[in-house]
């Protein structure tokens, strides 16, 4: 069976309902926490390390929920939402590979913010470079990622870690 290499907003919403990778497996969060509108490219090869990559996008408009509350009179997308989007995409990659379990962010190395997403922006682009996947008793994805707004890189994160768990009872 040929794997799908791009996903629409409707595909991602199906993933948030547990319909894409099957019950009990990797899911994306539902809106409003779903921070991706589409995955334009996903592959098990390529990227900075030759071990896989994802490119995804979020359309920006001034009516997005976070602009009204972060900050009043000084609207900016919270940087933590961009970081969470990168974790979301690493988890999606693990599910797309066919791995079982529910995704949980497990941390990251260095994170840098050197720009911002304002309501006047048009598009956020996420680039994820898979460094390593481990498929033992724990399924783990490790990746580096960047967030760009209208073509300008504004955040970076090293060693984003996401695990898939068949049981979260002891987590």
From Swiss-Prot:
The keyword Cytoplasm applies. Keywords: Cytoplasm, Fatty acid biosynthesis, Fatty acid metabolism, Isomerase, Lipid biosynthesis, Lipid metabolism, Lyase. InterPro entries: FabA, FabA_FabZ, HotDog_dom_sf. The active site is at 70. It is found in: Cytoplasm. GO terms for molecular function: (3R)-hydroxyacyl-[acyl-carrier-protein] dehydratase activity; trans-2-decenoyl-acyl-carrier-protein isomerase activity. Transmembrane segments: none annotated. Pathway: Lipid metabolism; fatty acid biosynthesis. GO terms for cellular component: cytoplasm. It catalyses: a (3R)-hydroxyacyl-[ACP] = a (2E)-enoyl-[ACP] + H2O; (3R)-hydroxydecanoyl-[ACP] = (2E)-decenoyl-[ACP] + H2O; (2E)-decenoyl-[ACP] = (3Z)-decenoyl-[ACP]. Its EC number is 4.2.1.59, 5.3.3.14. PANTHER family: 3-HYDROXYACYL-[ACYL-CARRIER-PROTEIN] DEHYDRATASE (PTHR30272), 3-HYDROXYDECANOYL-[ACYL-CARRIER-PROTEIN] DEHYDRATASE (PTHR30272:SF8). HAMAP family: FabA. Belongs to the thioester dehydratase family. FabA subfamily. Homodimer. This is 3-hydroxydecanoyl-[acyl-carrier-protein] dehydratase. It comes from Stutzerimonas stutzeri (strain A1501). The lineage of its organism: Bacteria, Pseudomonadati, Pseudomonadota, Gammaproteobacteria, Pseudomonadales. The gene is fabA.
């Amino acid at each position: 069976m040929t794997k799908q290499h791009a996903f629409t907003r409707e595909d991602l919403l199906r993933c948030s309902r547990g319909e894409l990778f099957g019950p009990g497996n990797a899911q994306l969060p539902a809106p409003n926490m779903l921070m991706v509108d589409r995955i334009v490219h996903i592959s098990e090869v390529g990227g900075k390390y030759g071990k896989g990559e994802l490119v995804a996008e979020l359309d920006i408009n001034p009516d997005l929920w976070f602009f009204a509350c972060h900050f009043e009179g000084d609207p900016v997308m919270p940087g933590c939402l961009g970081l969470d989007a990168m974790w979301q995409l690493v988890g999606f990659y693990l599910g797309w590979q066919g791995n079982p379990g529910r995704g949980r962010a497990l941390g990251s190395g260095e994170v840098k913010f050197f720009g911002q997403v304002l309501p006047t922006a048009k598009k956020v682009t996420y680039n994820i470079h898979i460094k390593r996947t481990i498929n033992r008793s724990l399924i783990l994805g490790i990746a580096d990622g960047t967030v760009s707004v209208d073509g300008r890189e504004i955040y970076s994160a090293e060693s984003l870690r996401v695990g898939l768990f068949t049981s979260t009872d002891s987590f």
